[in-house]
Amino acid sequence: MASKCLKASFSSGSLKVPGGAGGGSARVSTIFSSSSCKLSGLSRGPRSFSACSVGLGKSSCRAASCLPALCLPSGGFATSYGMAGGWFGEGILTGNEKETMQFLNDRLASYLEKVRQLERENAELESRIRDWCEQQVPYLCPDYQSYFQTIEELQKKILCTKSENARLVVQIDNAKLAADDFRTKYETEVTMRQLVESDMNGLRRILDDLTLCKADLEAQVESLKEELLCLKKNHEEEVNSLRCQLGDRLNVEVDAAPPVDLNRVLNEMRCQYETLVENNRREAEDWFNTQTEELNQQVVSSSEQLQSYQAEIIELRRTVNALEIELQAQHSMRDALESTLAETEARYSSQLAQMQGLIGNVESQLAEIRCDLERQNQEYQVLLDVRARLECEISTYRGLLDSEDCKLPCNPCAPDHSPSKSCLPCLPAASCGPGTAHTTCSPRPICVSCPGSRF
């Protein structure tokens, strides 16, 4: 319908009109398209035109049942036109050119009339279509905005539910992790409690061992006290016996009045032994006092340690829930206690070794004292023998002095012989004994001391 006006150019004024086989009346039918118009089925009188083609430049026109209004101009042809046609049947032009042109003009007029009619019908159809479209209620799309709002709300709820589910899943995972942590903490606490209980049992056993050691040491102290008392008693008895013996001997020797000052010697010996005994006694008392003080201090320290252990046990019972935090502190405390126990055992062993060494020293001193006492007893026996021999000699000399009435000169070898002086007889050293016979000796030229005498 939007095609341009056609310009018919007929070459050299010739027209070829195809005719039908029957040669009936002419009928024009137009067919329009975007760029062509074709005439078909033209027939007039005894001849029929089956097709008529009009060359319009580059476009062609075929007559059909309809032809658009703009395909041809409203007026006639202003320019020359050419038509070509073929006769069917006889194919021979009859009449002259004027009739042919008239025929063609009539045909063209009818054709144009038909075109105008079709244009009017087309316009009428267009107006009817336009009226129908105006009368027809326009189709409205349904309003889905409320549904969209509902869908958006539901989507928001779904997103919130998904986020809530994710949060719940995260919380569940966190709760599971926390439960696992608490389970591991509980297991560690249980194991730590078992370890602490085992440590407490070990400390109780150590405390029992220390109590037994304390009882043993107290028993040893008591036995050492008793032994010390026995030693003191024996020492006092021996000292008293020695004093009695030395006192008796002193009384006897005072009467003898020897040239050697035995009293001074005995006094010196007595002073030495008394000082030695006093020093030994003082040392023994000091040692005993120091050992007693040390044992008391050890008892006090053991009681303090026992109290500290009890306090630690109470503190451990209170701090069972915080064992994981104080684990290292408890380990260090245990190490400190073990080191203290080792130091205590080492100290006790060293003190025991010292006590054994002191006991060995005291025993060696006692052995030396016994040896000294035996030596003194031997010397005392020797002195008693000497005393007996001296008393025997004195009694012998007295008997001889009393029995003899002969008067011997004191110096018979001198030129002046005086009968008033006499010489004492000489006795051999071997004859001075309690069981020997008393014999006299011949007078000597010079009165000198006997070779075996002590005076």
Curated annotation (Swiss-Prot):
Residues 405-455 are annotated as: Tail. Keywords: Coiled coil, Intermediate filament, Keratin. Residues 133-143 are annotated as: Linker 1. PROSITE patterns: IF_ROD_1 (PS00226), IF_ROD_2 (PS51842). Residues 261-404 are annotated as: Coil 2. GO terms for cellular component: intermediate filament. Residues 1-97 are annotated as: Head. It comes from the Eukaryota. One of its GO terms (biological process) is epithelial cell differentiation. GO terms for molecular function: structural molecule activity. Residues 245-260 are annotated as: Linker 12. Residues 144-244 are annotated as: Coil 1B. The keyword Coiled coil applies. Residues 98-132 are annotated as: Coil 1A. The record marks 346 as: Stutter. Belongs to the intermediate filament family. There are two types of hair/microfibrillar keratin, I (acidic) and II (neutral to basic). This is Keratin, type I cuticular Ha5.
